[in-house]
Amino acid sequence: MSDLPSAVLFACTMNSVRSPMAEAIMKFLHGHQVYVDSAGVRSKDIDGYAVAVMDEIGIDLSRHHAKTFDDLEDDYFDIVITLSPEAQHSAIELTRVMACEVEFWNTMDPSLIESEDREVVLDAYRQVRDQLMQRIKDRFPVQTPLDT
């Protein structure tokens, strides 16, 4: 079982869907064991569908305030996980002034789904949520009392 990093940043393009979901999932799974934040190349208000699908699993995203990489100038992270190609480029720039690991998890942007059917759109968001949940559990395993 690998040790948890002390600080993780999840990053995507707008900090309105993917990275806030990942941040909230990581906090849900690991609580205060790890400092977790999220950012985007640009910022946009939290997406209502993201709030809805996270609420389905008992995680509240409604209070999320979007940030950009520029808002993180004084923060330090052990690892930056990028969820979009655009965020990957920004993370590489960030590592010029911060020695940290960068991982790219190519993650679909569900806000690009065009459908009049709300359930089709929600299913796309659920798919991203569930993929992020599994990826985070695989990369940062949750320790049970038997593991200690």
Locate the predicted segments by residue.
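Conserved active-site segments centered on acidic
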Residues: 1-71
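Cytosolic catalytic domains that perform sulfur/thiol-centered chemistry
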Residues: 2-7, 72-83, 125
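Conserved small-residue
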Residues: 15, 54, 80-81, 132
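Structural signal for conserved beta-strand scaffold positions within catalytic alpha/beta enzyme cores
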Residues: 38, 63, 82, 103-106
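Residue-level detector of flexible, active-site-proximal loop/helix-junction positions
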Residues: 43-45, 87, 109-111
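Short, charged low-complexity intrinsically disordered segments located at boundaries
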Residues: 55-58, 82-85, 102
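Mid-chain, well-packed structural core segment of small domains
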Residues: 75-98
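Phosphate-binding/catalytic loops
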Residues: 90-148
